[in-house]
Structure formats: C-alpha cells, structure tokens
C-alpha cells in the first residue's frame, strides 16, 4: 500500500531483511550435528513420519514438513558429494603431497555432514558445510556459529592426543588412523 511506501521511503522502517532473507538470529546445535550427523536426524524424521496417523488432519502439515526435511538432508548430502567428486577429479592431476590432500578432502566430503564427525578436520568441514548452506539459503542473515570452542574442543583434543595435529595445528600425514 502507498502509506507503507511513504514510511519506507522516509526511513521510518525498512523491510530489507524481511523481504530477501530467511529466519535469523539462530545458532545450529552443532554439538548434536557432529555427534549424530544428518543421518541421525534422517532416522528420527523417518520414524516420526512413519508414526503419523494421516487420518488426523493436523498431521498432514507434519507429514509435509517431514518430507521437506528429508529432501533437504538429501540435498545437503548431494552438495557435499559434489565437493568430494571435485576433489577426487583434482587429485587425478595433482602431484604427491597435494594429491594426498585432495584425496583426504574427497573422503571427508563424502562422509560429513551426513555421517557423524570423527576427527577435527571432519568436524570443521561438517560445520562449514552447514553454515555455508544456511548462508546461501538465508542470504547470510544473522547466523551464529554458537560456542564453536566448546563443540569443537573434543575433536581437537582427540586429534592432539593421537598425534594427528601438533600443538601449532600442523597436521602430520603419517599419524595413526
């Protein structure tokens, strides 16, 4: 309406963030995501969907929501798999150490965020994929990493203890798996 345009033009209020951005001011439960992976959420959603009584009208919206969640999980898995494939293709033309790095990247991207993270590198990659996808979906609007230090520390500590990471965050390629 014209009266709304007057307020927007004068700067009294704006709709920019509401017209072109998704939900905001949120932090993903990365601790849970890293522990169970998207596959954990997928199993739970499939169970909830299977338990719905579709003769109850209120459950139709739930069914549609669960179906959408499963589509998103599959899309995220496909997105990560594309990075895995690209790293694999790049490794074909790479030399020695770089080839090893690219093959490791390919392995990590084929695993997370769909499966739970089991190393510091996997945890970082999992968080990055989810954060990136949310940024793309919501136009980069008010997304927080939350307490990155708290949910990443167990993975850092474990890799430090295994010798996979040195104190200066130098990765060793010959550490025990």
Predicted regions and their residues:
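Amphipathic alpha-helical scaffolding segments
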Residues: 104-107, 149-154, 173
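Non-catalytic regulatory/linker segments of enzymes
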Residues: 132-137, 154, 160-162
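N-terminal accessory/cap region of cofactor-dependent oxidoreductases and related radical enzymes
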Residues: 1-135
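Inter-helical turn/loop segments and adjacent helix faces that build the functional surface
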Residues: 90-97, 156-168
């Amino acid at each position: 309406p014209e009266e709304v345009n007057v307020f927007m033009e004068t700067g009294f209020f704006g709709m920019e963030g509401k017209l072109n951005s998704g939900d905001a001011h949120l932090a993903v439960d990365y601790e849970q995501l890293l522990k169970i992976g998207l596959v954990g959420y997928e199993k739970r959603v499939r169970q909830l969907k299977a338990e719905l009584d579709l003769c109850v009208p209120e459950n139709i919206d739930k069914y549609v929501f669960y179906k959408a969640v499963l589509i998103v999980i599959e899309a995220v898995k496909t997105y990560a798999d594309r990075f895995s494939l690209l790293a694999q293709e790049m490794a074909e033309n790479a030399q020695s150490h770089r080839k090893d790095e690219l093959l490791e990247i390919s392995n990590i991207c084929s695993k997370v965020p769909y499966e739970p993270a089991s190393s510091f590198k996997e945890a970082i990659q999992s968080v990055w994929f989810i954060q990136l996808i949310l940024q793309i979906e919501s136009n980069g609007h008010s997304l927080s990493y939350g307490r990155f230090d708290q949910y990443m520390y167990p993975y850092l500590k474990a890799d430090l203890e295994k010798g996979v990471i040195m104190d200066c965050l130098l990765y060793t390629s010959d550490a025990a798996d």
